[in-house]
């Protein structure tokens, strides 16, 4: 496993990878969680012939703080594509979670062709701009009740403790607390993420 930082228009991106001809490119959803740790249970199961690449977007995981004012989804897609080019990736499977579902739609139009797309709970424009007054996700009621009952941080801590080894769980929380502290100390005009519009 190697870690590098790639300088892009949206800021420096922390990239974790193990190079092979065929690559699994994993992109996180919103939140502070580092991508490598978030996808570690999948990455551990890959055969040695398949490499992997995870990218921490600005202000998440191991990537440094960088103001995203004036940035948008196209800028983020261009930044991810720059990482693919820099690492000379020519064949890849894209594995996205949540908000990166929208990003996947942009990446699929780029010249380096994606062989397959695996979308885990993808967010799409239809989901982002949906009317939630009719509760379109009844299966999430229990999850929302638990979050309300114990608070989001405790709920998430319990979830990561059940999912990850003690070592990885500790590293996840150390990184998230460090990033959270950095973000709390920023000016009020600082923009954490780029804009996503209906276009």
Residue ranges and their predicted role:
Residues 96-100, 104:
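Gly/Ala-rich beta-loop-alpha elbow adjacent to hydrolase catalytic centers
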Residues 41, 106-107:
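Active-site signature of alpha/beta-hydrolase-fold catalytic machinery across serine-
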Residues 94-96, 120:
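Short beta-strand immediately N-terminal to the catalytic nucleophile in serine-hydrolase-like folds
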Residues 36-38, 63-69, 128-130:
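Conserved catalytic-core motifs of eukaryotic protein kinase domains, centered on the activation segment
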Residues 109, 115-149:
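Flexible "cap/lid" loop of the alpha/beta hydrolase fold
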Residues 54-93:
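Active-site loop/oxyanion-hole signature of alpha/beta-hydrolase fold enzymes
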Residues 128-131, 147-199:
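Conserved alpha/beta-hydrolase catalytic His-Asp/Glu region
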Residues 9-62:
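Conserved HGGG/HGGXW glycine-rich cap/lid loop of the alpha/beta-hydrolase fold
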